[in-house]
């Protein structure tokens, strides 16, 4: 199972680095920072489906 450590998030701004992750909402996030901020916003209901685009 793919996991991402989001313990040091949320962050006020994310870089534009492109390393896509696919969330459990079937949405592609541009990088870990964008994904982890979304995880925090979802109160932990969003999880990582897999690395790469959905």
Curated annotation (Swiss-Prot):
The keyword Ribosomal protein does not apply. It is found in: Secreted. Gene3D superfamilies: 3.30.60.30. The record marks 16-17 as: Reactive bond 3. It holds the Pfam family Kazal_1. It comes from the Eukaryota. Residues 4-54 form the Kazal-like domain. Its main location: secreted. Keywords: Disulfide bond, Glycoprotein, Protease inhibitor, Repeat, Secreted, Serine protease inhibitor. The keyword Metal-binding does not apply. Avian ovomucoid consists of three homologous, tandem Kazal family inhibitory domains. Disulfide bonds join 6-36, 14-33, 22-54. InterPro entries: Bifunctional_prot_inhibitor, Kazal_dom, Kazal_dom_sf, Prot_inh_Kazal-m. GO terms for cellular component: extracellular region. Glycans are attached at residue 43. GO terms for molecular function: serine-type endopeptidase inhibitor activity. This is Ovomucoid.
């Amino acid at each position: 199972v793919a996991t991402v450590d989001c313990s040091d998030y949320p962050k006020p701004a994310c870089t534009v680095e492109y390393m896509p992750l696919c969330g459990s909402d079937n949405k592609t996030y541009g990088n870990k920072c964008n994904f982890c901020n979304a995880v925090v916003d979802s109160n932990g209901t969003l999880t990582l489906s897999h690395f790469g685009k959905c």
